[in-house]
């Protein structure tokens, strides 16, 4: 089974391929400049999947990530990319400087749309953790400042295997794998 993963983010593509590799699902990537709607992670993911399916006229997969700080009632949330671009890792830490609570939740939502006129299905995963001063190689996104609960390393300090076995993306992809395996079986 082949699915187009609509992303221009090499890190997301690499992680997703690594996690899906055992399934035999063929993932090809296609970069599209989709309108960034505002709303919840679910609303954003659905809008992106529908738009991509309409443009490409085939089954598509899009992914959206959010990082919410408990002290800020879930901010920056789906806007983490823009916060990170504007403030950097140090700025994310400064946002929490006046708060004792440094806990955060990472969300990953994969949205699958089988075609232009089909419903969008969502597959979500979360990972609880803490925002810490940047540590580890800044390999992508906010990995250097997110330390998952129960671990002493940030995502950036972890091996790819460790991170890909516990992350919010892994948890969402585990749900997606079940769906895609069933879909592949039905198409035989």
From Swiss-Prot:
Keyword Cell wall biogenesis/degradation: no
Main location: cytoplasm
Broadest EC class assigned to this enzyme: hydrolase
Keyword Magnesium: yes
Catalysed reactions listed for this entry: ITP + H2O = IMP + diphosphate + H(+); dITP + H2O = dIMP + diphosphate + H(+); XTP + H2O = XMP + diphosphate + H(+)
Domain of life, per lineage: Eukaryota
InterPro entries referenced in this protein's UniProt entry, alphabetically: ITPase, ITPase-like_fam, RdgB/HAM1
GO terms (BP aspect): deoxyribonucleoside triphosphate catabolic process; nucleoside triphosphate catabolic process; nucleotide metabolic process
A cellular component annotation (GO) from this entry: cytoplasm
Keywords annotated in UniProt: Cytoplasm, Hydrolase, Magnesium, Manganese, Metal-binding, Nucleotide metabolism, Nucleotide-binding, Nucleus
Free-text comment on the cofactor: Binds 1 divalent metal cation per subunit; can use either Mg(2+) or Mn(2+).
Compartment(s) where it occurs, according to its Swiss-Prot or TrEMBL record: Cytoplasm; Nucleus
Needed cofactors: Mg(2+); Mn(2+)
A Pfam family per the record: Ham1p_like
Annotated binding of Mg(2+), by residue: 36
SUPFAM superfamilies: ITPase-like
Family, similarity comment: Belongs to the HAM1 NTPase family.
Stored PANTHER family: INOSINE TRIPHOSPHATE PYROPHOSPHATASE, INOSINE TRIPHOSPHATE PYROPHOSPHATASE/HAM1 PROTEIN
HAMAP family with a match to the protein in the record: HAM1_NTPase
Record's subunit section: Homodimer.
Name this protein carries in UniProt: Inosine triphosphate pyrophosphatase
Species per Swiss-Prot/TrEMBL record: Yarrowia lipolytica (strain CLIB 122 / E 150)
Lineage, uppermost ranks: Eukaryota, Fungi, Dikarya, Ascomycota, Saccharomycotina
